[in-house]
Amino acid sequence: MDFKSRKYKIKKHPKDCKLHAKKYRGTLNSKGKNDNDCLIMCMRCRKVKGIDSYSKTQWSKTFTFVRGRTVSVSDPKVICRTCQPKQHDSIWCTACQQTKGINEFSKAQRHVLDPRCQICVHSQRNDGDDNLESDKFVDPFIGDDSDLDDDIYIHDKQTINSEYADDVSDNTDEERTESKGQQESNSAEEYDDDDSDEDRMEEIFQQFKKEKQIV
């Protein structure tokens, strides 16, 4: 059988995949080799490790299927179990300033920048323990009543300033209207003065003509 003929030529695979990029523990001619014997390098510790050192999610990133064949990715970006970040089992509560277990926080509070435990959340809603009601709770992001008074004072001051600015703008508009009307009246008076000057010149010219005829 002529394997060099065009009939038996293997089609080219995509450029981002390599058919022989796998590194097996045994030789290439060893029997029973499969994908589980493949070694992959971790992108963080830069160590070549087997399938036992990777999770299923990370291991699925190393291979793909092309025309029914399992093909390894040329440069897979995978992280071994040792280098993967661990899940936090405790969270710092910003309300009571204590480190508590993750089970004491609701799922919504676990993903915010200022997490609060369930006890502190209930205490703010006036549904918590009586011991917590004895100590006045101050939200570090909102402040106490004095901060609220300051905010009200600042808001009132800004309102007064805005009203004063509106009054000043109204006065300036009236002044502009008056000045514009005065300019128009002045221009009309100047136009009347020009007409009177022309009439006077006409009278002088007519008088000059009469005197010349008499002579």
Curated annotation (Swiss-Prot):
It comes from the Eukaryota. GO terms for biological process: meiotic cell cycle; regulatory ncRNA-mediated heterochromatin formation; silent mating-type cassette heterochromatin formation; siRNA-mediated pericentric heterochromatin formation; subtelomeric heterochromatin formation. GO terms for molecular function: protein-macromolecule adaptor activity. It is found in: Nucleus, Nucleolus. One of its GO terms (cellular component) is nucleus. Transmembrane segments: none annotated. Residues 159-202 are annotated as: Disordered. Keywords: Cell cycle, Meiosis, Nucleus. Its main location: nucleus. InterPro entries: Stc1, Stc1_sf. Residues 164-176, 187-201 have a biased composition (Acidic residues). Pfam families: Stc1 (PF12898). Required for meiotic chromosome segregation. This is Meiotic chromosome segregation protein P8B7.28c. It comes from Schizosaccharomyces pombe (strain 972 / ATCC 24843) (Fission yeast). The lineage of its organism: Eukaryota, Fungi, Dikarya, Ascomycota, Taphrinomycotina.
